[in-house]
Structure formats: C-alpha cells, structure tokens
C-alpha cells in the first residue's frame, strides 16, 4: 500500500499516466476520481483512480486501491515505510480484503456487460450501410452489425456473448476509433469470422477485426479475432481445447517500429534525443546512459522472442515530485504471438512488406500491396508449428502418457497442477518425482495438455459446474458412528 498520495502519483507516472497540474489526487473510494492525463487531446477524462484511505491500529495512514487509463488497470503497490510487524500484517489483510472486493466487483461488471451486450446486439441491424472505416480498411463487414453509425463486433466465450466492441467511422483527437462495452471481461473473449465446427482442420487467429476480415477474405478459411496481442494466448488456449487436432495459424501483427517509437517518446515528453540503436548480436544489444539537466536516463535495447524492445528508466522531478518512470517498449504483436504459438503448438506468420511503409498487420498488407500478396504469404501449407517437436512415445510409455494427459490440468501462469483423481493441487516438481522427468516434460510440451485459469477451479456441491470450470468438490467426508 502507498504511504502517501504522492507515492500513488509516482506509481501512475511510472506507467506513463501523468497527473496534470492543478489536479490533486484524493481518496474517493468507493467512487471513482477522473482526470485528463498530460498529453491527452480529447475532452473526456480517460484516466481514473479509486483510492481508499486507511489507518493502522497505531494511527498511521496508508492508501490502497487501483488506477488506470481506459481499459488498463493497475493496483496500487506497497511503498517503503517504517511499518511495525503488526501494521504489516494489518496492511496485508486489508490488501487481501480489497482484492476479493475488486474481483467480485469485476465479476458483477462483467455480468452486467454481458446482459447489456445481448440487448444491444439484438437492437443492432444487419443491413450493410456505407461506413468510412470499412472503406478505409478495404474490408467487408464479416460477422458484425450496425448501430448508430458504429460497427458492432460481438465478443464470445465459447458460445456465450459476453461483450461488444464498437468501431467508429473516424478516430478522435487521441487517435482512437474503437472501444469495448464498459465492464466487458475481455480475457479469452473472441469474435469468430466464418463457420467453425468440430471438424474444422485449419483456423487463423489475429489481433484486430480489420485484420481478421482481410485474412478471412484472402484465405476463405475461418478466422478468430482476439482483439489485442495480450489476449492471443488465452484465446488460442480455448481454441486448442475445443479443436485439439486443428492446425492453428496465428497471423500476427509486427509492431516493428519500436526504436523510432522510443525516440519519438523521449523527444515529445522530455525534449531529449538519446542515442538508441540495435544490432543483431546477443540478447542485450545496446546500452545508453546520459544526464540532461535534472533528467537521468538509462536505456537499453534487448531481443526477446524474436523481437527487439527498448527498456530502462528515466529519473526526473515534476511539480516537486521525484519520478522514476519505467521504460518498457516492446514489439507486443510479435512477442505475444510467438509466446502463444509456442505454448499451444501453433503456426506463426507475420506480414512482409516489399516497400518502405508504416504497415504492421495483414490488413495493411492488403491495403498497400493487394489481396493476392496477402493470400500468398498466408498459405498454411508453408507453415510449421512452433515449439519443441514432440516425439511419438514408445509403445511402453504410451499408456502412461495418455493417463497423464487425462488426469492432470495445468493451472495457467503457475507451476501448480490439478490432480483429478486425488482431487487436489500438486506442484510440477512433485509430479516429476511421481512419474519421472521424461513423462512430465513430454506432457508439458504436448499441445493437448489441459490448462485452466485458477479462478475456474470452483466448489459446486450441487454438481452444477459452469462450462469451462473444474469442480473441486469431491463429496462430503463420511464419519462412522
């Protein structure tokens, strides 16, 4: 928890959300405070916060809660303070209480958004009308509807409509032409384009709707839109679970202009032009440090998952506050697509442009070089799955491996596994001791391996288990008389 409101402002600045002069943060919880961050052009405030003011039993004040900008959410982190062990325990308990409250509120918002999505989707028309976004992107309106001059894109989890994305004809002052229905739980939500059945053998996955339309047009194959790079992995996980034998091709965005984006950022925000470069040797490619006035800069470029990123920090003072802003600029499209492909045994392809261009995705390729060029680059016959190639198990191991695939489910983002026979959680290290390193490493590398989010482990004594969840209830204990 933050010990002062200045700590909260510095945490905001560290992720690029700058509180403007004249706006004082204040405890607003349970209501939200809002402001237009420095650099925003549109009039509607896009930055928000909800700050709780609390006191320890000794009377010391600390602040908890969350903040963000548009759909981005950050929890207020603990800051250094001379807390006693008792106070640290109190603060930890309060943090747990607020996390549980936050999760419940998010679920309530998601439920309301899902109901609203059904209502608006039923009101939206299917009649194709002229729309500047469609014309600008050279696409047909696959799978969408129209409502008040907006394209309405459905967002599903399995077969349930959980939200909507709205696309406007023109970008606003801040370059934004899309928004999600407020409260939508976007993680794992997708939009299908084309017919997908249990017999589907080939399916493409993309980030954005326009890219999805272009890929569907070029390949005449079903496409799934994940809406953003960070959502590729959870969406592909769902597809792989539903279609374990299908060939999945991730047609990724190549956000390749990281170095020029970093140079522009430093010039616009600090009026400095640091030397930033990259070569092809090694993971850490380039390191640069300099001090300009009261600005201290340390920045380096590094290569990860086949993409170059710019990292480091900038230290400076603003309105009497000492700011240490983290720099973390990556080729999110390439990085996230590569990770998802490796995790789930998918093929991976990025657009290649023949001329100097600002294009980054397959829609840009269609607009600039034509549908035929995109079709050629997207040919699935030329693509092989990423990740370690699994050798077929020997006959003596086959039964063991199939049993492990059926019995265990990996908990996403952890080293913990759900054992469906014992009805308990177990660490992967313990599994290796039980079944051997060879068998468990094979299981981890097999795209058929089951995986689930922790929140989808549910306790349902009545047996009414929500779709996509695992029931951890294994019956009431029987106590003899």
Could you tell me what each predicted segment is?
Residues 109-112, 150-244, 262, 271:
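Phosphate-handling DNA/RNA-contact segment within nucleic-acid enzymes
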Residues 22-28, 145-146, 347-358:
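Acidic carboxylate-rich catalytic motifs and surrounding loops in phosphoryl-/glycosyl-chemistry enzymes
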Residues 2-3, 15, 384-481:
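N-terminal nucleic-acid engagement/recognition segments and initiation subdomains in replication
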Residues 1-6, 201, 217-402:
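TOPRIM fold recognition
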Residues 131-148:
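Short, basic/aromatic recognition patches
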Residues 130, 211-212, 235, 361, ...:
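Short, hydrophobic/aromatic alpha-helical segments in well-folded domains
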Residues 1-132, 255-257, 262-267:
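Non-catalytic accessory segments of DNA primases and related replication-initiation nucleases
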């Amino acid at each position: 928890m933050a010990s002062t409101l200045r700590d909260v402002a510095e945490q905001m600045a560290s992720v690029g959300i700058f509180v403007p002069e004249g706006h004082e943060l204040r405890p607003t919880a349970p209501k939200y405070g809002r402001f237009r961050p420095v650099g925003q052009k549109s009039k509607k405030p896009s930055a928000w916060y909800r700050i709780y003011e609390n006191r320890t039993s000794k009377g010391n004040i600390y602040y908890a809660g969350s903040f963000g900008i548009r759909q981005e959410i950050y929890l207020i982190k603990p800051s250094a303070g001379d807390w006693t062990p008792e106070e640290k325990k109190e603060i930890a308990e309060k943090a747990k209480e607020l996390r549980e409250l936050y999760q419940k509120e998010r679920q309530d918002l998601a439920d309301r958004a899902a109901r609203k999505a059904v209502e608006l989707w039923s009101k939206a028309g299917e009649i194709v009308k002229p729309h500047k976004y469609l014309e600008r992107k050279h696409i047909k309106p696959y799978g969408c509807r129209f409502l008040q001059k907006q394209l309405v894109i459905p967002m599903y989890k399995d077969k349930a409509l959980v939200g909507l994305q709205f696309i406007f004809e023109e970008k606003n002052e801040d370059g934004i032409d899309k928004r999600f229905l407020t409260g939508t739980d976007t993680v794992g939500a997708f939009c299908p384009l084309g017919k997908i059945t249990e017999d589907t053998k080939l399916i493409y996955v993309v980030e954005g709707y326009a890219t999805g339309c272009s890929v569907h047009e070029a390949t005449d194959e079903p496409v799934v839109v994940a809406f953003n790079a960070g959502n590729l992995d959870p969406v592909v996980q769902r597809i792989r679970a539903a279609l374990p034998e299908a060939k999945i091709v991730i047609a990724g965005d190549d956000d390749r202009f990281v170095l020029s984006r970093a140079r522009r950022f430093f010039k616009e925000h600090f009026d400095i032009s640091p030397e930033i470069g990259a070569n092809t040797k090694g993971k850490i490619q380039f390191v640069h440090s300099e001090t300009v006035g009261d600005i201290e800069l340390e920045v380096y470029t590094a290569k990860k998952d086949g993409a170059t990123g710019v990292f480091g920090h900038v230290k400076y003072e603003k309105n009497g506050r000492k700011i240490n802003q983290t720099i973390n600029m990556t080729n999110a499209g390439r990085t996230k697509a590569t990770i998802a492909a490796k995790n789930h045994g998918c093929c991976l392809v990025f657009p290649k442009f023949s001329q100097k261009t600002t294009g980054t995705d397959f829609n840009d390729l269609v607009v600039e070089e034509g549908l035929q060029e995109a079709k050629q680059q997207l040919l699935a016959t030329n693509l092989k799955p990423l990740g370690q190639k699994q050798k077929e198990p020997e006959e003596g191991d086959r039964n063991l491996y199939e049993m492990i695939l059926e019995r265990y489910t990996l908990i996403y983002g952890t080293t913990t596994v759900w054992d469906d026979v014992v009805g308990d959680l177990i660490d992967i290290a313990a599994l290796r001791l039980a079944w051997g390193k060879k068998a468990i490493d094979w299981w981890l590398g097999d795209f058929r391996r089951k995986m689930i989010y922790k929140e989808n482990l549910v306790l349902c004594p009545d047996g009414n288990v929500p779709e996509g969840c695992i029931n951890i209830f294994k019956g009431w204990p029987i106590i003899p008389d």
